Amino acid sequence: MKFFKLLTASLLVLAVAFSTVSAASDTEKINWFFKSKGDNQRPEIPLSGILKDSDALYIGPEDEKTVYLTFDAGYGNENVEKILDVLKSHEIKGAFFILPGIIKNSESTVKRMADEGHTVCNHTTTHGDMARVTDITDFKNELDGVANLYRESTGYEMADYFRPPEGSFSKRTLEFCKTLKVTPVFWSFAYADWDNSRQPSPEKAKEKILSSVHNGAVILLHPTSKTNADILDDVICELKDRGYSFGTLDELYGKVAK
């Protein structure tokens, strides 16, 4: 009898310990990344297994020569307008993940995004580390703040796509997204284009993009980048010459979501 009591107690301790480890792993910070192979090969996505039970988007089908242009826009400047001009001239629809700053400072630019058929998406209200958000109410507030401001300013509803700032998330983040019916969006290509004081040269940027693009590429660019604004037309023309087409997030979701 004493043996069974000890065994039961031990099992309870193990159960508590296991639940604690599980809880910790659910909130552990995860940083999204990919391993580029160059030569237009699809990259290695080490974290794809973590996303298998979610509807997260990060790459399209391997057998389709389609790319998806996505932009993280925290604020507005003349480069954002130039990028919109280029997309319009090619009749390409992109996805813009926005913060409150660009709505407050460049409302007409944000409205133009929607008017011209681009998908305007959620990049949170504070651009904080979403892996640290462990309460679903706080998480919802992060999404609602920018979405409500967008609605009030433009009259449009924000699309139900969400990109965590700097790609920081946790398993809990994915659970919150599923509960709130929001689709997380990551990427299979990005490069160091965000710092306007240290912009890469147009030649190096084009080489980086054109050597890394691949079937199903979800490309992350920052539209405030002068380099991106200067090279986007050339990049699109070259990709078209190579036989690539350009898809939307809704199209990608329809192909890969469970």
Residue ranges and their predicted role:
Residues 4, 9-12, 130, 170, ...:
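Enrichment for repetitive, rod-forming helical segments
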Residues 196-200, 230-234, 258:
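Histidine/acidic-residue-rich catalytic or RNA/ligand-binding cores of hydrolases
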Residues 65-67, 77-79, 84, 88-220, ...:
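Metal-dependent polysaccharide deacetylase catalytic core of the NodB/CE4 family, i.e.
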Residues 214-250:
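Catalytic grooves of carbohydrate-active enzymes
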